Amino acid sequence: MASPFSGALQLTDLDDFIGPSQECIKPVKVEKRAGSGVAKIRIEDDGSYFQINQDGGTRRLEKAKVSLNDCLACSGCITSAETVLITQQSHEELKKVLDANKMVAPSQQRLVVVSVSPQSRASLAARFQLNPTDTARKLTSFFKKIGVHFVFDTAFSRHFSLLESQREFVRRFRGQADCKQALPLLASACPGWICYAEKTHGSFILPHISTARSPQQVMGSLVKDFFAQQQHLTPDKIYHVTVMPCYDKKLEASRPDFFNQEHQTRDVDCVLTTGEVFRLLEEEGVSLPDLEPAPLDSLCSGASAEEPTSHRGGGSGGYLEHVFRHAARELFGIHVAEVTYKPLRNKDFQEVTLEKEGQVLLHLAMAYGFRNIQNLVQRLKRGRCPYHYVEVMACPSGCLNGGGQLQAPDRPSRELLQHVERLYGMVRAEAPEDAPGVQELYTHWLQGTDSECAGRLLHTQYHAVEKASTGLGIRW
């Protein structure tokens, strides 16, 4: 079976699937307990293991398990095992939480929140032949029907990701004379790209990557911090699910950086792909078009939830376009009416320039797919990268073509993608600077745009993963 992960996470082997208990090659140090003597191991007919001590006592031995954190911190392979993700993050986990809620009084229930990405919404709209607004409302109705309390749109959290990316670029552009690694600034919203960068290029590439959190993880901060305060709950009392176009988002949600040590909870507890939501609809015997629409929920009083919104600049979030427009205005006082993209080798590598009197003031690019990412990294290593900013996405054609999106067996993939792109573009685009509720949250929740609180909740850090040298990784 083909792996659902992005190409950047499948580099070291033709078949990157590993069963962690069989093929994980990371050596584990086992501490010897004081006083432990010689013991025998007995294997039962059912495959279970028992330790027999010298005094005749027996103890069942637990199977070694590889957690998702183990995989993320290991350099033995590029990706994590699909089996780990399936057991820890799936629609079955959501159903368990919803079933558990039904067994207790409302005051003892966990508050279940689902945040839906615009890309997943467009994919579902294509499958059910609906427009994106009806899809959003009917999906809200479905989740409420099965026991979810609140349903949000991650386009709202993307406002913050875009604004922080814009500010970071302007700050780095102004400070490039003092720091050689200030530019180019590379987008950080794609977890497949981040995982590849940490494990393959490490300390060389990481200083170039934007520290702005992705929309998923900003939504994690909004739900587990701001919204939890509004509901007078601690973060661990909220179960937060996101619906994403990409399996790699499961890896992102599992990063230790997004784990609250005080309350022992993640910012995002479970990530469902678009395909898993479709499977959930099938298992519940629900046809999305047959549902009555329900209004979307709003995170704060100033934010409108009448209809879903989106952003200009393509199906991956529009990072290049928003950074370009903001930088042109902020750095050079130029208001860009229309952004003109120039395709280079292929449609997944395009560039944009801002010129004045024949001089190039800004040079930005987008690089989608592993082939283009490789070319970009090689140019950086040779010191021949002409760009100030690059929107990097691991999937060819970007997030609308993510591995978790719905496929149509009776329809060519290119035709389906074009249809999804059209549906995605039907949603009203909103400038993050003008979005209702955003400035209110910067003022009252984050205590300002450049505050310590904004840095902690809207930004993250990256970690180079050192290569482990072990003969166990050799395949003969």
Swiss-Prot record:
Q: Which InterPro entries would you find in this protein's record?
A: Cytosolic_Fe-S_CAF (IPR050340), Fe_hydrogenase (IPR009016), Fe_hydrogenase_lsu_C (IPR004108), Fe_hydrogenase_ssu (IPR003149)
Q: Name one GO biological process term.
A: iron-sulfur cluster assembly
Of the GO CC terms on this record, one is: cytosolic [4Fe-4S] assembly targeting complex
- List residues binding [4Fe-4S] cluster 2: 190, 246, 395, 399
Please indicate if the UniProt record lists Acetylation as a keyword.
yes
Please provide the record's keywords in A-Z order. Answer: 4Fe-4S, Acetylation, Iron, Iron-sulfur, Metal-binding
- This protein's record includes keyword DNA-binding: no
The residues the record assigns to binding [4Fe-4S] cluster 1 are: 24, 71, 74, 77
MF terms (GO), sorted A to Z: 4 iron, 4 sulfur cluster binding; metal ion binding
Q: How does it assemble?
A: External component of the CIA complex. In the CIA complex, interacts directly with CIAO1 and MMS19.
Give the family from UniProt: Belongs to the NARF family.
Chain's role = Component of the cytosolic iron-sulfur protein assembly (CIA) complex, a multiprotein complex that mediates the incorporation of iron-sulfur cluster into extramitochondrial Fe/S proteins. Seems to negatively regulate the level of HIF1A expression, although this effect could be indirect.
Q: What is this protein called?
A: Cytosolic iron-sulfur assembly component 3
Species: Pongo abelii
